[in-house]
Every structure is written in structure tokens, then in C-alpha cells.
Amino acid sequence: MLATLSQIRAWSTEHLIDAAGYWTETADRWEDVFLQMRNQAHAIAWNGAGGDGLRQRTRADFSTVSGIADQLRRAATIARNGAGTIDAAQRRVMYAVEDAQDAGFNVGEDLSVTDTKTTQPAAVQAARLAQAQALAGDIRLRVGQLVAAENEVSGQLAATTGDVGNVRFAGAPVVAHSAVQLVDFFKQDGPTPPPPGAPHPSGGADGPYSDPITSMMLPPAGTEAPVSDATKRWVDNMVNELAARPPDDPIAVEARRLAFQALHRPCNSAEWTAAVAGFAGSSAGVVGTALAIPAGPADWALLGAALLGVGGSGAAVVNCATK
């Protein structure tokens, strides 16, 4: 069924222009965030398997994001060009309608063309009827071209962006272990774990964060951690955000290391308060600008702000935590 005359008059490509701008901005934002992560991962003086793993991961993720960004830029180009094509097709329809009206015909909502002159000789009436039919045919032809242009642009956009939302980042890289490895002394038939909140016999923690590195963050039994509640909440948030990563994931390891240092080697109160406040602001900003990044924007935004200094405040946290 063809569109009505009112629908054709109101036909708009504003959504395509808006989408093109949003896709371009999003592509630039994604690449900027992940490029900064990759570059600063290479600038960090962190040697060994963990540092190699971080650099490998940020390189791979930047490559993935660059591919997605290119798709969005292609979609933006299609949307802009398509908007021009559709606008031209819509104008062609309206020109045909105006031609019919200028010739003394009425164009109805259903695109039918009727003569406004009812009393005229039979020969003239027959000629006018033939003219009306020709004008109606031309209008309908142009409407068909308009609908076809809209459908073509829609199909091109679907083909270009269809898999963007399904992109997944590669899993954590496999890091070869050296001959010397950290070991724990957990026994499957060991003592019964203590109740929640009590110190674990091995110095670790029971519950979902019982890996050796996370357990290091617990303050010594019977002592107060020399940090504020805000710092503790920050550490808890970091661990919770990265809990889905495997314990030996280099990124999770480094995040836990930073959290450990925050608990055990804090700056003075004023410095740490400023650093945490800055981190909170930049983290929220990165999460906001990382909208629609598939597969894990929260943990990357957190690590990007805290470890790699996105927006500068993450660097303040690193400097403060490692004093």
C-alpha cells in the first residue's frame, strides 16, 4: 500500500541525519577511549607476564573496537547519503503533486487525481480525464521510487550495522608461566572454613574472592586498616566490578594489586580524598561515554579510569596509591 499524501508531505530524514551524527561521535569516542588505554598500557613500567598480558589485551581490544568504529562510520556515510537521496525523491513527488494542482486538478489523500472543472465539453472532458490519469500515474511512480529509496537505505544500514551489537571481545590472553610460580597451600580436605567475616587460616578470604591475590587485600587480623571508609568502598567496588574476570586475568590481577596498595599504602587523607573523588568523576564519565560498547564497558571503564589515567584523575589514584 502506497503512502498517503499527508505522509509524503511529512516525510522526514531527520532521523538519518541524527543517527549519522551519533554514530560518528560514538565511533570517535570508542576509539579515543581504547586508544588511550592501549597507549598508556605501553607507557606503564610493568614488566613480566602481567604487563605483557595487559598490553596484549589492550592491543586486541583496540583492534576490535576500531573495526566496530569503522562499521559505524560507514553506516553514518550511508545515512547521510541516503538522507539526500530520500529527500530528493520526496521533493520529486511533491513537484508532481504541484504540477497536477497547477493544471487545475485535485490530488487526494489516496493520490488520486480528479478534475476540479465539472462543466466542460465532452472532448475537453475526455482529454482532461486522460491527463489526470497520466498525472496520477506519474505521482504513483515517484512515490514508489521514494519508498524504494527508503527501503534501500534501511537495508544498507541493517547490513552494515547488523552485527555491531553482537561483537564480543576476545577472552583473557593465555600467559605462559615461568618456572617459578606462586602457589597456595589450599588442601581439598583441609580445615572447615571459618564463618563469614572471620580470618581465613591461610590468610585468604572465603567467598567469591578467595583467590590468593584478592586475599592479600585483607588487613592483618586484629588491626584496623589505615584507610577511610571511602577507600574501602572504592576497593570493594573495584573488586565487584572485576569479579567476573578469571583470577589470573592480567587485568584483574593488576586491578587487585592497585586496590591492595590503596588499602595498605594510602596517601594522607586530603590527597586520597581528592584522588578518589577524581576517580569517581572520571569513572562515571568514561562509563557515560562508553555507552553501547559491547561486552564489558564497566570493567574496562573502571580499569581505564583507575589504572590507565583516563581523564587524568585515574593517574592521581595510581600515584596516590603507590606512594
Swiss-Prot record:
Start and end residues of each stretch annotated as Disordered: 186-227
Keyword Membrane attributed: yes
Subcellular location: Cell membrane
UniProt GO cellular component terms: cytosol; plasma membrane
Membrane topology: Multi-pass membrane protein
Cell membrane listed as a keyword: yes
Official protein name in the record: Uncharacterized protein Rv2077c
Originating species: Mycobacterium tuberculosis (strain ATCC 25618 / H37Rv)
Lineage of origin: Bacteria, Bacillati, Actinomycetota, Actinomycetes, Mycobacteriales
